[in-house]
Amino acid sequence: MTNKIDFNDRMLSLGLARVSEAAAIASADLIGRGDEKAADQAAVNAMRDQLNKLDISGVVVIGEGERDEAPMLYIGEEVGSGHGPGVDIALDPLEGTTLTAKDMPNALTVIAMGPRGSMLHAPDVYMEKLAIGPGYKTDLVSLEMSPRERILALAKAKKCEAKDITVCVLDRPRHQKIIEDVRSTGAAIRLITDGDVAGVMHCAEPSTTGIDIYMGIGGAPEGVLAAAALKCMGGQIYGRLIFRNDDEKARAIKAGIKDFDRIYTKDEMVTQDVIFAATGVTGGSLLPAIKREVGFVTTETILMRSKTGSIRRMIYKNPTG
C-alpha cells in the first residue's frame, strides 16, 4: 500500500548514500578477480539489505530485470521497512560488472530515489541517448540532428572549434557510423567499454572529466538513471526507445509505454525531485576507486539532491573488523 507520508529528500539522502556505499564495499574483494556474476551478486545482496533498513515504502522501477529474470531487486519488488513515504527506486548495484571483474576504470554503484510515480518505467530494451552538460539553451542539440550537426552546434555555443570537443561513445559495432561522423569534424572521441550512466554523468563536469557530449545507443534503464543524475547536476539528456522485435514492443506496452517514437527529456524520465547516489568501485575521472588497507575500506560517494541542487562528495572510512 502506498504510504502518504511526504517525500523528505533531505532526511532520506544519507540513507541512500549508505545503500550505495554498502554495494560498493561488498564488491571490493571481487575487483580484478574475473568473476562478473559474483561481483554483481555481492553488490545486489548488500544493496537490498541496506534498502530494507530504510523507513520507506519503496518499489523498484529500474532494477535487475523482470521478476522471472532476477531473484532480487527485480522490477516491481517492494523494498524498505514499509513504514515511510512511497518512493520509486532506480538502481544498478554494479554498473560495470565487466569493468569490476577486469579492474578497469569507471565501475560504480548507482541508485536514485523519488516520490512514487515520478520515474519512467523503462522496459529492458535499448535507448538512443544524447546528453550535454549544464549552461546551454534547451534543444541546442537533438536526436534529430546528425552527430556532425550536434558537434558543430555545441562548438558554436562554447565558442570553440569542433576539434576542441570531446565525445563519449560506447565502443560497439553499432556506433561505427557515429564514430566516423564525429571524427569527420575533427572532434575527439573517448570510447568506453561499459558504463554509460557514468558516461552521461561525465558531460555534467567537463572541466573535470574532459567530456563535452555523450551520444549513442545503450540500455533504456540506464537512461533513466542518467536522467536522474543530470536532474541533480544540470544538463540535458534526450532518449528514444529502440525496439528490435515485437517481443520488445510487448515488453514496452506492459511497462505502460504507448508512444514508441517519443523522445523523452530528463524531466519526462524523472518528473519530480530526486536523490541520486553513486560510489566509485574501480575509479575513474568522476569518482576514485575503493581503497583497501589493513582494517579499513575507504569509499567516495557523490550524493545529490535535485531540489536544492546540492552535490556532496562523501569519504567513508569503513572498519572491516
Predicted features along the sequence, with ranges:
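N-terminal subdomain of lithium-sensitive/metallo-dependent phosphomonoesterases centered on the IMPase/IPPase/PAP
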Residues: 1-90, 149-152, 156, 197-198, ...
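A short glycine/serine-rich beta->alpha loop
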Residues: 10-13, 34, 98, 137-139, ...
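Short basic, glycine-rich beta-strand/loop surfaces that mediate nucleic-acid
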Residues: 79-80, 109-112, 210-214
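DPxDG-like acidic metal-binding loop motif
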Residues: 84-95, 99-120
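A short local loop/turn or secondary-structure capping micro-motif enriched for an aromatic residue
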Residues: 108-109, 129, 320-321
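Short, acidic/small-residue loops that bind anionic groups at enzyme active sites
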Residues: 113-115, 119-125, 192, 239-244
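Glycine-rich phosphate-binding loop plus the immediately following alpha-helix
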Residues: 116-154
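An extended, acidic
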Residues: 144-296, 300-305
